[in-house]
Regions:
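Short, charged/polar surface micro-motifs in flexible loops or helix N-caps
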Residues: 47-50, 59-61, 74-76
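Short hydrophobic/aromatic beta-strand element in the GNAT-like acyltransferase core
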Residues: 42, 50, 68, 113-114
């Protein structure tokens, strides 16, 4: 039924201007304001895909990762994030190193992954498989 459909995801934020700056200026993504719909952004990502971000006054951050960015060199990306003032999330139940990276590959437990949040508290990851 949906084969060939160009599916997309969306999530909310409490301040659309902070989101625009964070995703555009801080993370370097192509951010498009949807002029026809105030409070709506599209992140234009690879292969013509989009991620919709919308303003929600009573926003509650998701308790799960809303966005995963595959990367070739997680150490380099984590260093860049840290240099931009982004703090990585630490989870007591996970064995993360001093940088905040879960080294899953070396433990045969999946990919290397690190998490951080956007200004609205949504969880984002960088992941090296």
């Amino acid at each position: 039924m949906f084969k060939g459909s160009k599916a997309f995801t969306s999530f909310s934020v409490n301040d659309i201007n902070k989101a625009k700056d964070f995703y555009g200026k801080t993370l370097g993504l192509d951010v498009e304001e949807v002029k026809e719909m105030k409070g709506l952004l599209n992140l234009n990502i690879a292969d013509g895909n989009k991620i919709m971000i919308y303003h929600r006054p009573n926003h509650t951050p998701a308790a799960y990762t809303v966005l995963n960015f595959p990367v070739n060199n997680i150490d380099k990306i984590v260093d860049e994030l840290t240099n931009k003032g982004i703090k990585l999330e630490r989870y007591k139940e996970l064995e993360q190193d001093e940088k905040g990276i879960l080294r899953g590959k070396s433990m045969n437990k999946g990919p290397d992954i690190a998490w951080f949040t956007d200004p609205a508290g949504n969880i984002i990851s960088v992941i090296e498989e």
